[in-house]
Amino acid sequence: MKVNLDRTSSGFCIGVQGTIHLAEEKLREHDGKLYCLGDIVHNEVEVKRLEELGLITIDLNEYSALTNAPVLIRAHGEPPSTYTTAKSNQLDVTDSTCPVVAKLQRSARMLHNRGYQIIIYGKKNHPEVIGINGQCDNQAIIIKHPDLSAPEETAPLDFTRRTALISQTTMDVPGFAMLKENLERLFSASAGPGERHAASHWQDIRDIDLTAEITGVRPLPKFLYKDTICRQVSSRNSKLHDFAAQNDVVIFVAGKKSSNGQVLFNICKASNPRTYFAEDEKDIQDEWLLENRQPVQSAGVCGATSTPMWLLEKVARSIESRFSS
């Protein structure tokens, strides 16, 4: 059996990689004691490794009660209230918010402050979405289903307001496009005769367009969208699809809490039905890698943006050792 490890489209994205490096650095600085608000990464194996080095994962209630202590803000980002608490509690904060997420937060805040109704394509309880919504005074409308199949998600929409569609950085590009088209139809159907054209053709904007509005050079359109999906993440979709197709069996390694992991696993599964989900090498069942009681010719090992490369390598070595004979 040949074991193929995907090193180009799997493993930590830049944002998570930066957070992990900062955590290790701060743990050394603070003699092996550092608090992190929420799981530093949605991978239980990596969290356990860092906790063994001294990282202490805390929830919001524990964070609010903490004083004069070093705290790490993870790559997902946080709402403004988290920083207010840090200041009042004299916390030594290391902010490792992903630059892509930080840019998205600024866009959301600017559009909200200009009076826009903000729609976020994302998952309501995902920490990144909570942070983005916080930039909008927690007034954003969050839609997970691009086909608008959940009426409770669209019920709060005000069809008379200026409206902006943005996205959680790890959502899928086709879903974002579908949501935009469905919102165009929905707003057009609800608009008056004079508004139907604008409502049915939402405009794509760039950062320069936001600056033009703020400086008074030209106004933003009433209905707009800004594709804020991280391309480093989304570009993995097609690459992992191809990788999965090139192997007899695929072992996809990720944490069960990983939103990105679920998306990428489903992409691999669609490309190769013999794709199996594992958190680590202990989850792998021998029968996954057999065909007519013989080892398959090739097994691919890949993972999510929250899966460390050391874990992927460990899984690959485990498969090789189990089927080396």
From Swiss-Prot:
InterPro entries on file: LytB/IspH
A GO molecular function held by the record: 4-hydroxy-3-methylbut-2-enyl diphosphate reductase activity
Documented EC number(s): 1.17.7.4
Gene3D superfamilies in alphabetical order: 3.40.50.11270, 4-hydroxy-3-methylbut-2-enyl diphosphate reductase, catalytic domain
Cofactor(s) needed for function: [4Fe-4S] cluster
Active site, UniProt feature: 128
Cofactor binding comment, as recorded: Binds 1 [4Fe-4S] cluster per subunit.
Amino acids binding isopentenyl diphosphate: 42, 76, 126, 258-260, 306
Sequence positions that bind (2E)-4-hydroxy-3-methylbut-2-enyl diphosphate: 42, 76, 126, 169, 258-260, 306
Binding residue positions for dimethylallyl diphosphate: 42, 76, 126, 258-260, 306
Residues annotated for [4Fe-4S] cluster binding in this entry: 13, 98, 230
Superkingdom of source: Bacteria
Pathway: Isoprenoid biosynthesis; dimethylallyl diphosphate biosynthesis; dimethylallyl diphosphate from (2E)-4-hydroxy-3-methylbutenyl diphosphate: step 1/1; Isoprenoid biosynthesis; isopentenyl diphosphate biosynthesis via DXP pathway; isopentenyl diphosphate from 1-deoxy-D-xylulose 5-phosphate: step 6/6
Reaction(s) this enzyme catalyzes, per UniProt: isopentenyl diphosphate + 2 oxidized [2Fe-2S]-[ferredoxin] + H2O = (2E)-4-hydroxy-3-methylbut-2-enyl diphosphate + 2 reduced [2Fe-2S]-[ferredoxin] + 2 H(+); dimethylallyl diphosphate + 2 oxidized [2Fe-2S]-[ferredoxin] + H2O = (2E)-4-hydroxy-3-methylbut-2-enyl diphosphate + 2 reduced [2Fe-2S]-[ferredoxin] + 2 H(+)
Function according to Swiss-Prot or TrEMBL: Catalyzes the conversion of 1-hydroxy-2-methyl-2-(E)-butenyl 4-diphosphate (HMBPP) into a mixture of isopentenyl diphosphate (IPP) and dimethylallyl diphosphate (DMAPP). Acts in the terminal step of the DOXP/MEP pathway for isoprenoid precursor biosynthesis.
Family statement: Belongs to the IspH family.
The protein's name in its UniProt record: 4-hydroxy-3-methylbut-2-enyl diphosphate reductase
